[in-house]
Amino acid sequence: MKTEYDILIIGAGPGGAMAAKTAAEEGLSVLMVEKRPAIGTPVRCAEGVGKELLHEFIGPDPAWISADIERATIVGPDGTSMSLEAQRAGNEVGYILDRKVFDRALVWQAAEAGAEVQVKTRAIAPILENGFVRGARLQGYGTTTDVRAKVVIAADGVESKFARWCGVDTAVPVNEIETCAQYLLTDIDIDESATVFYLGNEIAPEGYAWVFPKGKRTANVGLGISGKKNLPGNRPIDYLNRFVEKNFPNGKTIECIVGGVSVCTPLASTVSDGLMIVGDAARISDPLTGGGIYNAMYSGRLAAQVAIECIKRGDCSRAALAAYDQQWRVSAMGKALDRNYKIKEYFIRQSDEKLNALAHSFKKINMEKFSTLELIKELIKHNPKLLFELKTLRDSLNS
């Protein structure tokens, strides 16, 4: 490990790996550090991602695909269900990954492109000069080293500390973070080609439960609830235990993971002087689903592309790096974040009675292709009692 690079990346998840690969392919010197001793572990993710979205970055490999999903099923509080086949669901169906293998594949590609990778190495402080981020103090393998860089990319996940140390407000209100628990269950009866989403305030208040197939009679079974609902006796693990006891009483637990995901609006700015913030660290996980793999990869690649140009011009100021912030906000991803935040805010306010009414009307809807706006228009037709609320939601999405 040298003490000076073009780009220093904090975190080796999908966002960091895409940034490292993109920059290294252009000949820049890149160091990516990961605080954990192994890439891809521990997994804190339901591991689902849309096929078309993923193909934008990497071709499918059976080594890291656990299941190829053909449909998505939504189940209302009273058990009413609606299924969307792949041709109608679009990015709501895709692959269930093996993140341990997938993350390592991405980092391997970054290393092959020329990026240096250091595991068991954490950033413990930024190097700041008159408010300009000039690198980071790294600690690993019993030593502490100051590493300077023209640009630092913070890709250190939902628990990101680095951007905060640099003066960026990264706080998430407790009601805008989902606290989650998940079991990897085996010996259970499931549709191995479908993801299933369960709604209901008794199941997962202000969140949802999921069943994501991982292979033969095996699935990730988990849920997320609003942080403000996380109370003694009603923690995510408590809700999950009740859900599993009801739906998979004979399932055998292979693994248990817990974690959190932000469902807020993105950071007010994802750049500063010498600093760029990507993925969950930038609070750009999907506020409706909590999904973050694609968004991390997209933002990581875009950040590197902008950083490359700024380094070539010799200007890595906030004003120069702002092109990254501006571009992702007007992208399809940025627009989806805005739209899905509004939809999330609508659904978390609904009672089980209203959720059931919506679920019942889903079954009457026949759309050629899944579209959020078309779905809401159809729901308005079938739910006159919810006319005002749904029209307000539709109008906000059109604004």
Swiss-Prot record:
InterPro entries: DGGGPL_reductase, FAD/NAD-bd_sf, Geranylgeranyl_Rdtase_fam, Geranylgeranyl_reductase, GGR_cat. Binds 1 FAD per subunit. It catalyses: a 2,3-bis-O-phytanyl-sn-glycerol 1-phospholipid + 8 oxidized 2[4Fe-4S]-[ferredoxin] = a 2,3-bis-O-(geranylgeranyl)-sn-glycerol 1-phospholipid + 8 reduced 2[4Fe-4S]-[ferredoxin] + 16 H(+); 2,3-bis-O-(phytanyl)-sn-glycerol 1-phosphate + 8 oxidized 2[4Fe-4S]-[ferredoxin] = 2,3-bis-O-(geranylgeranyl)-sn-glycerol 1-phosphate + 8 reduced 2[4Fe-4S]-[ferredoxin] + 16 H(+); a 2,3-bis-O-phytanyl-sn-glycerol 1-phospholipid + 8 A = a 2,3-bis-O-(geranylgeranyl)-sn-glycerol 1-phospholipid + 8 AH2; CDP-2,3-bis-O-(geranylgeranyl)-sn-glycerol + 8 AH2 = CDP-2,3-bis-O-(phytanyl)-sn-glycerol + 8 A. GO terms for biological process: glycerophospholipid biosynthetic process; membrane lipid biosynthetic process. Its cofactor is FAD. Keywords: FAD, Flavoprotein, Lipid biosynthesis, Lipid metabolism, Oxidoreductase, Phospholipid biosynthesis, Phospholipid metabolism. FAD binds at G15, E34, C45, A46, G48, R99, A123, D280, G292, I293. Its EC number is 1.3.7.11. Pathway: Membrane lipid metabolism; glycerophospholipid metabolism. GO terms for cellular component: membrane. Pfam families: FAD_oxidored, GGR_cat. GO terms for molecular function: flavin adenine dinucleotide binding; geranylgeranyl reductase activity; oxidoreductase activity, acting on the CH-CH group of donors, iron-sulfur protein as acceptor; oxidoreductase activity, acting on the CH-CH group of donors, NAD or NADP as acceptor. HAMAP family: DGGGPL_reductase (MF_01287). Belongs to the geranylgeranyl reductase family. DGGGPL reductase subfamily. Is involved in the reduction of 2,3-digeranylgeranylglycerophospholipids (unsaturated archaeols) into 2,3-diphytanylglycerophospholipids (saturated archaeols) in the biosynthesis of archaeal membrane lipids. Catalyzes the formation of archaetidic acid (2,3-di-O-phytanyl-sn-glyceryl phosphate) from 2,3-di-O-geranylgeranylglyceryl phosphate (DGGGP) via the hydrogenation of each double bond of the isoprenoid chains. PANTHER family: DIGERANYLGERANYLGLYCEROPHOSPHOLIPID REDUCTASE (PTHR42685:SF18), GERANYLGERANYL DIPHOSPHATE REDUCTASE (PTHR42685). Reduction reaction proceeds via syn addition of hydrogen for double bonds. This is Digeranylgeranylglycerophospholipid reductase. It comes from Methanosphaerula palustris (strain ATCC BAA-1556 / DSM 19958 / E1-9c). The lineage of its organism: Archaea, Methanobacteriati, Methanobacteriota, Stenosarchaea group, Methanomicrobia.
